[in-house]
Curated annotation (Swiss-Prot):
<feature type="binding site">
    <location>
        <position position="97"/>
    </location>
    <ligand>
        <name>Ni(2+)</name>
    </ligand>
</feature>
<keyword id="KW-0479">Metal-binding</keyword>
<dbReference type="Pfam" id="PF03079">
    <property type="entry name" value="ARD"/>
</dbReference>
<keyword id="KW-0560">Oxidoreductase</keyword>
<dbReference type="InterPro" id="IPR023956">
    <property type="entry name" value="ARD_bac"/>
</dbReference>
<feature type="binding site">
    <location>
        <position position="99"/>
    </location>
    <ligand>
        <name>Ni(2+)</name>
    </ligand>
</feature>
<comment type="similarity">
    <text>Belongs to the acireductone dioxygenase (ARD) family.</text>
</comment>
<comment type="subunit">
    <text>Monomer.</text>
</comment>
<keyword id="KW-0408">Iron</keyword>
<feature type="binding site">
    <location>
        <position position="97"/>
    </location>
    <ligand>
        <name>Fe(2+)</name>
    </ligand>
</feature>
<dbReference type="GO" id="GO:0010308">
    <property type="term" value="F:acireductone dioxygenase (Ni2+-requiring) activity"/>
</dbReference>
<feature type="binding site">
    <location>
        <position position="99"/>
    </location>
    <ligand>
        <name>Fe(2+)</name>
    </ligand>
</feature>
<dbReference type="GO" id="GO:0016151">
    <property type="term" value="F:nickel cation binding"/>
</dbReference>
<dbReference type="InterPro" id="IPR014710">
    <property type="entry name" value="RmlC-like_jellyroll"/>
</dbReference>
<dbReference type="GO" id="GO:0010309">
    <property type="term" value="F:acireductone dioxygenase [iron(II)-requiring] activity"/>
</dbReference>
<protein>
    <recommendedName>
        <fullName>Acireductone dioxygenase</fullName>
        <ecNumber>1.13.11.54</ecNumber>
        <ecNumber>1.13.11.53</ecNumber>
    </recommendedName>
</protein>
<comment type="function">
    <text>Catalyzes 2 different reactions between oxygen and the acireductone 1,2-dihydroxy-3-keto-5-methylthiopentene (DHK-MTPene) depending upon the metal bound in the active site. Fe-containing acireductone dioxygenase (Fe-ARD) produces formate and 2-keto-4-methylthiobutyrate (KMTB), the alpha-ketoacid precursor of methionine in the methionine recycle pathway. Ni-containing acireductone dioxygenase (Ni-ARD) produces methylthiopropionate, carbon monoxide and formate, and does not lie on the methionine recycle pathway.</text>
</comment>
Length: 181
Protein backbone atom coordinates (compact mmCIF):
# COMPACT_ATOMS: atom_id res chain seq x y z
CA UNK A 1 0.00 0.00 0.00
CA UNK A 2 1.32 3.43 -0.91
CA UNK A 3 1.97 5.75 2.01
CA UNK A 4 3.36 9.13 2.98
CA UNK A 5 5.26 9.68 6.23
CA UNK A 6 6.01 13.30 7.14
CA UNK A 7 8.92 14.07 9.49
CA UNK A 8 10.40 17.24 10.92
CA UNK A 9 14.12 17.29 10.12
CA UNK A 10 14.88 17.30 13.87
CA UNK A 11 12.86 14.09 14.48
CA UNK A 12 13.91 11.44 11.97
CA UNK A 13 12.63 8.56 14.13
CA UNK A 14 9.07 9.77 14.66
CA UNK A 15 6.81 10.88 11.81
CA UNK A 16 4.43 13.79 12.46
CA UNK A 17 1.84 11.98 10.37
CA UNK A 18 1.42 8.90 8.22
CA UNK A 19 -1.08 8.92 5.37
CA UNK A 20 -2.33 5.93 3.36
CA UNK A 21 -5.30 7.26 1.36
CA UNK A 22 -4.52 8.41 -2.17
CA UNK A 23 -6.43 11.68 -1.79
CA UNK A 24 -4.62 12.58 1.45
CA UNK A 25 -1.20 11.74 0.02
CA UNK A 26 -1.89 13.66 -3.20
CA UNK A 27 -3.23 16.79 -1.47
CA UNK A 28 -0.38 16.93 1.06
CA UNK A 29 2.25 16.61 -1.68
CA UNK A 30 0.41 19.05 -3.97
CA UNK A 31 0.96 21.78 -1.36
CA UNK A 32 4.64 21.55 -2.38
CA UNK A 33 4.12 21.21 -6.12
CA UNK A 34 4.58 17.44 -6.12
CA UNK A 35 2.05 15.49 -8.18
CA UNK A 36 0.99 12.04 -6.99
CA UNK A 37 -1.57 9.90 -8.73
CA UNK A 38 -2.48 6.31 -9.36
CA UNK A 39 -2.71 4.98 -12.90
CA UNK A 40 -3.71 1.52 -13.92
CA UNK A 41 -0.70 -0.57 -14.88
CA UNK A 42 -2.67 -3.39 -16.47
CA UNK A 43 0.13 -5.05 -18.43
CA UNK A 44 2.20 -7.30 -16.17
CA UNK A 45 5.87 -6.33 -16.15
CA UNK A 46 8.57 -8.00 -14.09
CA UNK A 47 12.01 -6.76 -13.08
CA UNK A 48 14.43 -7.67 -15.83
CA UNK A 49 11.99 -6.83 -18.63
CA UNK A 50 13.69 -4.97 -21.45
CA UNK A 51 13.26 -1.23 -21.79
CA UNK A 52 11.59 -1.76 -25.16
CA UNK A 53 9.05 -4.22 -23.68
CA UNK A 54 8.07 -1.82 -20.90
CA UNK A 55 7.83 1.24 -23.15
CA UNK A 56 5.75 -0.66 -25.70
CA UNK A 57 3.41 -1.95 -22.98
CA UNK A 58 2.76 1.59 -21.71
CA UNK A 59 3.04 3.59 -24.93
CA UNK A 60 -0.39 5.22 -24.44
CA UNK A 61 0.38 6.46 -20.91
CA UNK A 62 3.86 7.60 -21.93
CA UNK A 63 2.58 9.53 -24.94
CA UNK A 64 -0.06 11.23 -22.77
CA UNK A 65 2.57 12.42 -20.27
CA UNK A 66 5.03 13.48 -22.96
CA UNK A 67 2.40 15.51 -24.80
CA UNK A 68 0.90 17.06 -21.67
CA UNK A 69 4.22 18.11 -20.09
CA UNK A 70 6.66 18.37 -22.99
CA UNK A 71 8.96 15.53 -21.95
CA UNK A 72 11.48 14.57 -24.64
CA UNK A 73 13.17 11.48 -23.23
CA UNK A 74 11.83 8.28 -21.71
CA UNK A 75 13.68 5.33 -20.23
CA UNK A 76 13.06 2.47 -17.86
CA UNK A 77 14.85 1.49 -14.70
CA UNK A 78 14.28 -2.15 -13.84
CA UNK A 79 16.06 -3.75 -10.91
CA UNK A 80 15.70 -6.96 -8.98
CA UNK A 81 17.64 -8.62 -6.19
CA UNK A 82 19.92 -10.42 -8.69
CA UNK A 83 21.20 -7.21 -10.31
CA UNK A 84 25.04 -7.20 -10.10
CA UNK A 85 25.23 -3.45 -9.35
CA UNK A 86 22.31 -3.17 -6.92
CA UNK A 87 24.49 -2.01 -4.00
CA UNK A 88 26.26 0.67 -6.07
CA UNK A 89 23.02 1.95 -7.57
CA UNK A 90 21.31 2.04 -4.18
CA UNK A 91 24.20 4.02 -2.68
CA UNK A 92 24.09 6.54 -5.53
CA UNK A 93 20.32 7.06 -5.37
CA UNK A 94 20.44 7.35 -1.54
CA UNK A 95 22.55 10.51 -1.71
CA UNK A 96 20.49 13.69 -1.46
CA UNK A 97 20.35 15.36 -4.85
CA UNK A 98 18.23 17.56 -7.06
CA UNK A 99 17.61 17.91 -10.77
CA UNK A 100 17.32 20.89 -13.09
CA UNK A 101 14.05 19.43 -14.37
CA UNK A 102 11.01 17.63 -13.00
CA UNK A 103 11.60 14.01 -11.99
CA UNK A 104 8.70 11.84 -13.14
CA UNK A 105 8.33 8.17 -12.26
CA UNK A 106 5.54 5.75 -13.10
CA UNK A 107 5.90 2.51 -11.13
CA UNK A 108 4.72 -0.41 -13.25
CA UNK A 109 5.98 -3.14 -10.88
CA UNK A 110 7.40 -3.41 -7.38
CA UNK A 111 8.05 -0.49 -5.05
CA UNK A 112 10.52 2.18 -3.91
CA UNK A 113 10.78 4.92 -1.29
CA UNK A 114 11.00 8.45 -2.72
CA UNK A 115 12.02 10.86 0.05
CA UNK A 116 11.72 14.62 -0.42
CA UNK A 117 13.50 17.25 1.71
CA UNK A 118 11.42 20.41 1.60
CA UNK A 119 12.33 23.22 4.01
CA UNK A 120 12.27 21.79 7.55
CA UNK A 121 10.34 18.65 6.62
CA UNK A 122 11.03 15.29 5.05
CA UNK A 123 8.28 13.54 3.08
CA UNK A 124 8.85 9.79 2.63
CA UNK A 125 6.61 8.55 -0.19
CA UNK A 126 6.33 4.79 -0.53
CA UNK A 127 5.55 4.31 -4.22
CA UNK A 128 4.14 1.02 -5.44
CA UNK A 129 2.79 -0.46 -8.65
CA UNK A 130 0.44 2.01 -10.40
CA UNK A 131 1.86 5.09 -8.62
CA UNK A 132 2.86 8.14 -10.62
CA UNK A 133 5.00 10.78 -8.89
CA UNK A 134 6.29 14.03 -10.36
CA UNK A 135 8.83 15.94 -8.28
CA UNK A 136 9.45 19.57 -9.32
CA UNK A 137 12.86 20.67 -10.56
CA UNK A 138 15.17 21.76 -7.76
CA UNK A 139 13.51 19.65 -5.03
CA UNK A 140 16.07 17.95 -2.78
CA UNK A 141 15.37 14.23 -2.54
CA UNK A 142 16.73 10.69 -2.52
CA UNK A 143 15.40 7.29 -3.54
CA UNK A 144 15.69 3.96 -1.76
CA UNK A 145 15.08 0.75 -3.64
CA UNK A 146 15.96 -1.43 -0.63
CA UNK A 147 18.69 -4.00 -0.12
CA UNK A 148 16.83 -6.46 -2.34
CA UNK A 149 15.23 -4.28 -5.01
CA UNK A 150 12.14 -5.25 -6.94
CA UNK A 151 10.79 -2.49 -9.13
CA UNK A 152 10.24 -1.32 -12.67
CA UNK A 153 9.67 2.40 -13.23
CA UNK A 154 9.23 4.46 -16.36
CA UNK A 155 11.20 7.71 -16.15
CA UNK A 156 10.37 10.80 -18.20
CA UNK A 157 12.66 13.78 -18.74
CA UNK A 158 12.73 17.25 -20.28
CA UNK A 159 16.49 16.83 -20.74
CA UNK A 160 17.59 14.69 -23.71
CA UNK A 161 20.52 13.48 -21.57
CA UNK A 162 18.13 11.73 -19.16
CA UNK A 163 18.95 11.36 -15.45
CA UNK A 164 21.37 14.11 -14.40
CA UNK A 165 21.73 14.59 -10.63
CA UNK A 166 23.27 17.51 -8.76
CA UNK A 167 24.31 16.08 -5.40
CA UNK A 168 23.96 18.38 -2.37
CA UNK A 169 26.73 16.76 -0.29
CA UNK A 170 24.45 16.68 2.77
CA UNK A 171 24.14 13.48 4.82
CA UNK A 172 20.47 13.91 5.78
CA UNK A 173 19.36 10.76 3.93
CA UNK A 174 21.30 8.57 6.36
CA UNK A 175 19.27 9.86 9.32
CA UNK A 176 15.84 8.85 8.01
CA UNK A 177 14.20 5.42 7.68
CA UNK A 178 15.02 3.33 4.68
CA UNK A 179 12.72 1.16 2.62
CA UNK A 180 13.24 -1.98 4.69
CA UNK A 181 13.52 -0.29 8.09
Amino acid sequence: MSSLSVYHVSSPDIPNKVLTHLEDIASTLAEHGVAFDRWEAATPITPGASQEEVINAYRTQIDTLMTRHGYVTVDVISLNSDHPQKAELRARFLEEHRHGEDEVRFFVAGRGLFTLHIDDYVYAVLCEKNDLISVPAGTRHWFDMGENPHFVAIRLFNNPDGWVANFTGEDIAGRFPRLED
